[in-house]
């Protein structure tokens, strides 16, 4: 079996008219500006953000290319503090309050403007 040792890249696609809203959402969620962005045309624009040891890219897509929503899990040291910060931030849609699962993971969820769910969690194991 091959071991994967590189960084993880998450690519989220949106139509051009939603691009700036999605880019701004991830800028607020991650608390950083993109480390790389471009805007060559309606089908060639994007923004890349660092997320732990990986990247999250928000990319434009052609109208005829549809992708479904995804779930992204991002670990944070303090779920409750992150929840308070994002509740106070503009443009963040909270879809669930912090809860602790029976197996010890605490999380809450937000939804980006394109319908993707982001679980912000902390696990003790």
Please identify what each model-predicted range represents.
Residues 16-20, 72-117:
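Vicinal oxygen chelate
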Residues 1-23, 70-72, 124:
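N-terminal beta-strand motif that seeds the catalytic metal site of vicinal oxygen chelate
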Residues 27-35, 90-92:
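Conserved acetyl-CoA-binding loop of GNAT-fold acetyltransferases
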Residues 12-14, 38, 98, 122:
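A cross-domain feature marking catalytic cores of carbohydrate-active enzymes
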Residues 33-70, 117-122:
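Conserved short beta-strand elements that form part of the metal-binding/catalytic scaffold
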Residues 25-28, 85:
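Alpha-helical scaffold elements within enzyme catalytic domains, especially in hydrolases
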